[in-house]
Each structure stands twice: as structure tokens, then as C-alpha cells.
Amino acid sequence: MATVADSGTARPSSIDHSGEGALARLGLRFTNLAENWFPDAYVFVCLAVTVVAAFAMLNGAAPMAVAKSFGDGFWSLITFTMQMAIVAIGGYVVASSPPAAKLIDGLAAMPRSGAGAVAFVAAVSMLTSLLSWGLSLIFSGLLVRVLARRADLRMDYRAAGAAAYLGLGATWALGLSSSSAQLQANAASLPKSVLQITGVIPFSETIFPWQSLVIALVLISISIVLARLSAPSSVTAVTAQMMDVDLEQTQVAQLPGRKRPGEWLEYSPLLTLIVVALGGGWIVQEFASKDPILAISNLNTYNLLFLMLGMLLHWRPRSFLNAVAKAVPATAGVLIQFPLYGGIA
């Protein structure tokens, strides 16, 4: 494969950003700072454990008592950890389904400029994050790849990638998959020590009050404007091609042909329809018998809804299973960090 240098295209590091606006230059400085100095989120969790343990001992707690408290709480969030992992998987399988790919293709045709495309990605990322942070992360990332294929946009790939994370970085905590709101709304997921203090706090008091909705609207509006203003111009934009990003990979992998009789059910929608009918029937009863806000605040109901939708959109069990296999690595942070949060609690 020809390198960037071989093709005669400038490398990102050689781009002159002196013509950019003050906001764009500030964004580039913060980008360089974050890339060079910020460690993985796991490191921050370990630092939090260290700081909390140190302050506990400074307040007179014996080291072995601190260790016992940490160990006793380590698995207190295990149910919630599994639930949040399913949130990531459910969002991924829905976003990577064939119908979602067609929707992404349609959305990618809408922007008319590179900077406009960055702002558009920011809007899509934040709006979808109100439904699911897992859906937002994958859907927006796939949208960036499709937009990057449009040579007429000359979109800055770095800015678009950052915009795709705005849902996870700015608004997801105001949406249905908010870990804090979901945790407080589900008594079975809360550690007993926390439940005794706070009790159960439903979505009607966290996500759906008018104050929260206004905050979400203002935050989304300001973030879209900032994404538009901070995006590099078409002259200085670093495109995906300049970064040697492979854009030929398709969003939805084609299923290989059946090679053995045992694969027939994996490629048939029969079992999908049966399972979705059962799950969908339960979901309909749940929403019919309860306040919709109360029903969706149940994390098990929320996860079942996304899994059933993912199964239906993928249609064939093999396609669904392939999507789940690709989604599992995205749960690594949840699986290893949440027990540490439990140890702190």
C-alpha cells in the first residue's frame, strides 16, 4: 500500500494551522495535550481508589479495615456491571445492523461542507446518546466513516471523530442509559449502603424534569455551535485519506454462505421471530401496565428492548451473533472499572 509520503500528500503534522480561527487553534492545543498526557480511564479509577483509601487512613481507619471495606464492596455492583455491559452490546448491535447502515448512508448525504459535517456528527452523536450511549458511540463512528468517503466535503477526520464522542462526553448522562440515573432508579442494582441513604430515585426526578430537558437542549445547541466553529477549514483539514485510514471496509459484513446443514437455523429468521415475539409481548405488557417512564427506568426492560430490536434488525441469528462478538470488546472498561467503583462505595 502506498504511504502518505509516496502519494505526495502532506502529513497531518506538516499542516500549517496559522490560518485557523482562535477557537480551532485552542482545540488543537487541547487535543495535543490530551493525546500526550491523559492516561486510560482505568488509571483514573485506580487513582480514585488510592486517594479514597489514603483519606480513609488519614481519618483514622486502620489499613486492614480499609482493605476489608474495599474487598466487601468490590462485587456490590456486579448486577449493575452486567446490565451496563448489555447497554453497550445492545446499542452496538442496533447501530451495526443493515437497516441502520442504510439510515447512516442517507444521513451522510445531508451535510454540504466539511465543517458542517463535523457539526452534523456532533448533533447526531448527542441526540442518539439520549437513547443509548452504546448506540451513539457506534452509530456516530460509522457515520464519520461514511462522511469521510465523500471527497467533496474535505472533512477534518480528527474533528469529526471528536464530534462522534460528544454524545458520550456531553449528553449521555442526561439520557435513558445514564449509569447514575439507572443505578438510582433500580433498587436491585444499588449497594445496600447507598440505598439506605438515597432510596430509589425514578427517572421522573432525574432525567425527565423540565430543568433537565432545558439543560440538555442548551448543552446540545452550544456543543453543535462549538463543533462548527472549532472545525478546521477545508484548506487545513486533515482528511482520512491523509491519515492513511482504510475507508474501504464495509459497515455491515456480508455473511458467508452456509457450509453445513447445522448452519441452517443460524441463517434462518425463524428463531429470531419466535424470540422477538416473546420478548416483544412481554415489553408491550410492561408498558401497558405501568407508567411508561417507570417502565423504561427499569434497566432490565430497557436492555431487553434494545436486544429484541437488535435481533429483529439483524434478522438472522448469525448476523446478530457476529455483531455481539464485535461488541464485547467495547464492554472491557465497564467490566473492569465498575467493580473498582464498588470497592470505593
What are these regions (language model features)?
Residues 56-60, 116, 129, 173-174, ...:
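Alpha-helix boundary/capping detector
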Residues 52-56, 170-180, 342-345:
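C-terminal TM-helix exit segments that contain a strictly Trp-centered aromatic cap at the helix terminus
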Residues 1-88, 208-221, 225-337:
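Hydrophobic transmembrane alpha-helices of multi-pass small-molecule transporters
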Residues 54, 126-130, 166-173, 279-284:
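Aromatic-anchored segments of alpha-helical transmembrane domains
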